[in-house]
Amino acid sequence: ITEAGFGSDLGAGKFLDIKCPTAGIAPSCIVLVATVRALKYNGGVPKDKVAEPNLAALEKGIVNLAAHLANMQKYGVPVVVAINRFPQDTQEELDYIAAYCKGRGADFALSEVFAKGAEGGVELAQKVVEAVAKPSAFRSIVAGCGSIRERLETIAKTIYGAREVIYTPAAEKALRDILALDPAMDGKPVCVAKTQYSLSDDPAKLGRPTDFAITVRDIRLSNGAGFVVALTGDIMTMPGLPKVPAAQGIDVDEKGDIWGLF
């Protein structure tokens, strides 16, 4: 079981297109996790209003879930949509999502582990057990791509829904420098660093953006890890930290004892 964080266009994509082919493994099922409030946010509701019932916004924002679902189904593996239920979610909203998913060939389950503990995860677990028993034919979407550019374009157009990929002069130079080291580098997998808030490289473009370009501002070689990193937007490759990282509460006294560890 692998938890591939961020949106499915990022975490799941890297697991399915980099790790699985490299390790020679294939998933038996994909669990796509969403929340009612996030879908309403994608439907235009301000963050401080997402807990309020709003079926109209849900109907507008569900195109985001539809895009992620369609993307995961391209890998040839059964998909289960799991909704992390919040107390404010209405039955009408949950029923709408369930019907929407089933109409698109995906199983649906509620996850209520936070409120009910292990009991709240039984429904989802049962759906996953049923899904892994179904036939599947996993295939990476970049299988057969012969170059870094081709892999980037396939990911951008097939998963993000982009119109094209634009390279800045810095990215063009970086790619030339990488290939100058060894032309075989063109066979490296591509790890895209992109915002998790949008299918595009612009976090303000919610829902299901269309007719947009993905701009690659730089390309870096992570040769030890075995891939190249394509940087888009202003995303950082460092792990996300809170405004006050836990490290600020850690200290070492004059005796060499460490304080503030969890």
PLM regions and their residue ranges:
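P-loop NTP-binding site
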Residues: 1-81, 85-93, 99-262
